[in-house]
Amino acid sequence: MIHKYDYHKTHFLFSTSCIKNLLYNVSKEIAFTGSSNVGKSSVINTLTNQKNLARTSKKPGSTKTVNVFEVEPGVNLIDLPGYGYVTMPVALKYHWQHDLIYFLQKCTNLKGLVVLMDIRHPMKFLDKYIIQCAIENKIQVFILLNKADKMNAYACNTQYHTVQQHLSNLESNIKITLFSSVTKLGIKKLKAQLDSWFSIVS
């Protein structure tokens, strides 16, 4: 049976600069990831109906720590640092990418991975790589094509089918939805997916 969670009650739990610290959690977890400046913080704020729960910035790569938010006791959302930002120091960039892959391989409490993409520039190399790693580690993936308000309906539909085509060769049933923090497009589908994942009995 799928439980309906009240994401409006979500609150900040803790931050860590070491993603491996999450491996010691016993809570159910769903992680949000994506390239820098894709709008992860805005999506989390829209989901929880809280303007400042996750800090937003116009400067790409601002989230340099892992931020954990508690929906209710034992149920967490994880905001992972953006990957691939071009001006990030190379050593730091590869450190985070390595730790993210390690997290996907080792985290036993991860119920699903929400991969955000800017609908104007979807399926970058690192997006594909992260999705493939998730599939290999039997982690369910949900793709949000974010910033859909930046394009007209026809262009959004074209990008949607382009992403579908990219995923057609993968042996996994990955769901995709258009999303906008401005118009709230896709918010019901996002909540339904999170509810479904959190309701999975281990």
Curated annotation (Swiss-Prot):
In terms of Gene3D superfamilies, this protein maps to: P-loop containing nucleotide triphosphate hydrolases
Q: Which residues bind GTP?
A: 34-41, 61-65, 79-82, 146-149, 179-181
Enumerate the SUPFAM superfamilies for this protein: P-loop containing nucleoside triphosphate hydrolases (SSF52540)
Provide the binding site for Mg(2+): 41, 63
Molecular function terms in GO for this entry?
GTP binding; metal ion binding
State its cofactor.
Mg(2+)
The record's keywords, sorted A to Z, are: Cell cycle, Cell division, GTP-binding, Magnesium, Metal-binding, Nucleotide-binding, Septation
Keyword Methyltransferase among record annotations: no
Give the InterPro entries listed for this entry: G_ENGB_dom (IPR030393), GTP-bd (IPR006073), GTP-bd_ribosome_bio_YsxC (IPR019987), P-loop_NTPase (IPR027417)
Q: Name one GO cellular component term.
A: cytosol
Q: What biological-process terms (Gene Ontology) are attached?
A: division septum assembly
Q: Which family does it belong to?
A: Belongs to the TRAFAC class TrmE-Era-EngA-EngB-Septin-like GTPase superfamily. EngB GTPase family.
PANTHER family this protein is in? ENGB-TYPE G DOMAIN-CONTAINING PROTEIN, MSS1/TRME-RELATED GTP-BINDING PROTEIN
Quote the NCBIfam families the UniProt record gives.
GTPase_YsxC
- Quote the function comment for this protein: Necessary for normal cell division and for the maintenance of normal septation.
Name of the protein: Probable GTP-binding protein EngB
Q: What organism is the protein native to?
A: Baumannia cicadellinicola subsp. Homalodisca coagulata
Higher taxonomy: Bacteria, Pseudomonadati, Pseudomonadota, Gammaproteobacteria, Candidatus Palibaumannia
